[in-house]
C-alpha cells in the first residue's frame, strides 16, 4: 500500500471501479495533504460514481487543501449534479468561512433540486456549529435530533416539514436502530426528494439490517428513480452482505445506467469482502 499506487489507480479509467474505490478509501484513511491531492485525480475521470465518492471522502477528511477543489466542483455547470451535490455536502463539514458560505448560499437557489437541497442542508449544518462524528464513523449532513421515536417518525414522514429537521429525524432513527425505526425509514423511501431517498439508502447501508433489503431492492429496481437513489441502494445492499442482496445486485452488473452498473460492481466487491476472509478492504495493491 502507498499513496502513489492509489493515486495511479484512481486516475486511470481502465482500472476497475471496484479497485479504484478500494484505493480511494485507502487514501481516506491516510490523513495527509498528499492523500487529499491524490484523491483529486478522480475529478478528471469519466466516472460519476468515482467523482461523487471522491467528493464525499474529501468532506470526511476535512483537509484544508480540498476546499478550493470542492468549490470548483460545486460551481461547475458542466459537471453531473450527483457530483456537485456531494461537493456541496462536503463543504458543510468544514469550519464556516466566507467563501464556503457564499457558495452554499448561491447554490441553495440552484434550479436542480439535488444541488439546492444539499446546499441548504450544508448551510443549516454550519449554522448549528457542531462537529460530531457519528457512531458509524461518518460526518453527516445533519445532527441527530433529540426526542422520541414517535416524534422522529412524524417529522421524517412529513413532506411539509423543514428538510433539515427531517434529516435530523432520519439520523435519530438510524442511531436508534430498532425494527420500528427501520420500517419508518423504509416508509420514507416513498418521498418525492431524490436527495432525501438517497440519504435514507446510505443510512440503511450503515445500519446493515436485513429488514431494509426489500426497500433497497425496490429503490434499485425502479427505472424511473433518480440514479443517485438507485446507486445508493445498490451500495447499501453490498454493505449488508446478504445472499438475497447479492442475487438482486447480480441482475444489474451490465445495466446501461453507468452509475448503477458501477455501484453494483462495487457492491458485489464489498459483499465479497464482507462475507470472505480478507483482512483489509482499503488497500491500494
Curated annotation (Swiss-Prot):
User: Protein name, please?
Assistant: Deoxyhypusine hydroxylase
Locate the residues binding Fe cation 1: 52-53, 85-86
Summary of the function given for this chain in its UniProt record: Catalyzes the hydroxylation of the N(6)-(4-aminobutyl)-L-lysine intermediate to form hypusine, an essential post-translational modification only found in mature eIF-5A factor.
Question: Mind listing the UniProt keywords for this protein, alphabetically?
Answer: Cytoplasm, Hypusine biosynthesis, Iron, Metal-binding, Monooxygenase, Nucleus, Oxidoreductase, Repeat
Which GO cellular component terms, listed alphabetically, does the Swiss-Prot or TrEMBL entry include?
cytoplasm; nucleus
> Which positions does the entry assign to HEAT-like PBS-type repeats?
50-76, 83-110, 165-191, 229-255
Please list the reactions this protein catalyses.
[eIF5A protein]-deoxyhypusine + AH2 + O2 = [eIF5A protein]-hypusine + A + H2O
Q: How is the cofactor bound?
A: Binds 2 Fe(2+) ions per subunit.
Where does it primarily localize? Answer: cytoplasm
Q: Name one GO molecular function term.
A: metal ion binding
EC supergroup of this enzyme: oxidoreductase
Per the record, the similarity remark reads:
Belongs to the deoxyhypusine hydroxylase family.
Entry-linked SUPFAM superfamilies: ARM repeat
Q: Check the record and name the Pfam families matching this protein.
A: HEAT_2
Name the cofactor(s): Fe(2+)
- Gene of origin? LIA1
Q: What is its EC number?
A: 1.14.99.29
Q: Where in the cell is it found?
A: Cytoplasm; Nucleus
The record lists Fe cation 2 as bound by 198-199, 231-232
The protein's annotated pathway:
Protein modification; eIF5A hypusination
Q: Does the record's keyword annotation contain Lipoprotein?
A: no
Amino acid at each position: 500500500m502507498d499513496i502513489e499506487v492509489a493515486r495511479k489507480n484512481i486516475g486511470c479509467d481502465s482500472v476497475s471501479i471496484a479497485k479504484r474505490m478500494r484505493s480511494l478509501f485507502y487514501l481516506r484513511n491516510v490523513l495527509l495533504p498528499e492523500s487529499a491531492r491524490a484523491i483529486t485525480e478522480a475529478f478528471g475521470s469519466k466516472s460519476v460514481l468515482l467523482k461523487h465518492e471522491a467528493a464525499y471522502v474529501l468532506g470526511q477528511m476535512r483537509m484544508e487543501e480540498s476546499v478550493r477543489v470542492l468549490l470548483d466542483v460545486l460551481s461547475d455547470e458542466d459537471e453531473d449534479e450527483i457530483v456537485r451535490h456531494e461537493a456541496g455536502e462536503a463543504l458543510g463539514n468544514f469550519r464556516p468561512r466566507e467563501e464556503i458560505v457564499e457558495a452554499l448560499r448561491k447554490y441553495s437557489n440552484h434550479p436542480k433540486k439535488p444541488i439546492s437541497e444539499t446546499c441548504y442542508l450544508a448551510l443549516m449544518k454550519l449554522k448549528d456549529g457542531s462537529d460530531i462524528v457519528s457512531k458509524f464513523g461518518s460526518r453527516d449532513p445533519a445532527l441527530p435530533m433529540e426526542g422520541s421515536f414517535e416524534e422522529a417518525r412524524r417529522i421524517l414522514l412529513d413532506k411539509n416539514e423543514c428538510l433539515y429537521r427531517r434529516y435530523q429525524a432520519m439520523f435519530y432513527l438510524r442511531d436508534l436502530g430498532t425494527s420500528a425505526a427501520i420500517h419508518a425509514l423504509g416508509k420514507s423511501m416513498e418521498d418525492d426528494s431524490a436527495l432525501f431517498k438517497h440519504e435514507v439508502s446510505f443510512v440503511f447501508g450503515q445500519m446493515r439490517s436485513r429488514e431494509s433489503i426489500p426497500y433497497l431492492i425496490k429503490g434499485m429496481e425502479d427505472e424511473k428513480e433518480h440514479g443517485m437513489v438507485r446507486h445508493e441502494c445498490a451500495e447499501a445492499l453490498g454493505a449488508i452482505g446478504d445472499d438475497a442482496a447479492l442475487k438482486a445486485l447480480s441482475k444489474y452488473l451490465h445495466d446501461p445506467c453507468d452509475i448503477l452498473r458501477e455501484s453494483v460492481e462495487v457492491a458485489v466487491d464489498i459483499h465479497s469482502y464482507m462475507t470472505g476472509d480478507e483482512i483489509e478492504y482499503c488497500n491500494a495493491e
